[in-house]
């Protein structure tokens, strides 16, 4: 029997007008005040090239584009930050690695948001990248 405990992260969903805000519950004590480990996704679909990369102490974001103008975006955020989903989009709750995850789609995009218990991760892309987006948690690695 292990004497260690994994932190439990519960989420609160608040509806405000046309959006739903999702954030860690009030009882969650953040493990980080800044991003200490940067993550990236690998195995980007063929034809996509790096378009931009932004990084600061609270989040980072990488965007790839292909010749058709389709985009694929990966971001990492502190778990203490919240995010919002427009209520007009179809949102499904999933479970990834024992944590709640949120998958939503619109007319021409798909987005998956999940956590590892320390950070939020989001993969967003145009509809042609939907298959990759659903498998994104299996392509995440720590950046060297």
Region locations from a protein language model:
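Surface-exposed amphipathic alpha-helical segments
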Residues: 117, 125-144
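Membrane-interface helical sensory segment of bacterial ECF anti-sigma factor regulators
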Residues: 1-26
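Compositionally biased, low-hydrophobicity segments enriched in charged and small polar residues
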Residues: 1, 39-42, 139-140
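Functionally constrained cores in energy, signaling, and assembly domains
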Residues: 15, 76, 135-137
């Amino acid at each position: 029997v292990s004497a260690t405990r994994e932190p439990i992260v519960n989420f609160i969903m608040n509806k405000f007008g046309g959006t739903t805000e999702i954030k860690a519950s009030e009882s969650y004590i953040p493990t980080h005040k800044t991003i200490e480990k940067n993550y990236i996704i690998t195995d980007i679909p063929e034809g996509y090239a790096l378009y931009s990369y932004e990084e600061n102490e609270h989040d980072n974001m990488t965007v790839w584009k292909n010749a058709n103008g389709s985009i694929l975006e990966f971001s990492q955020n502190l778990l203490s930050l919240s995010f919002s989903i427009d209520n007009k989009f179809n949102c499904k709750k999933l479970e990834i690695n024992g944590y709640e995850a949120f998958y939503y789609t619109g007319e021409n995009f798909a987005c998956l948001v999940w956590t590892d218990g320390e950070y939020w991760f989001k993969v967003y892309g145009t509809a042609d990248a939907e298959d990759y987006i659903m498998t994104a948690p299996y392509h995440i690695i720590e950046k060297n």
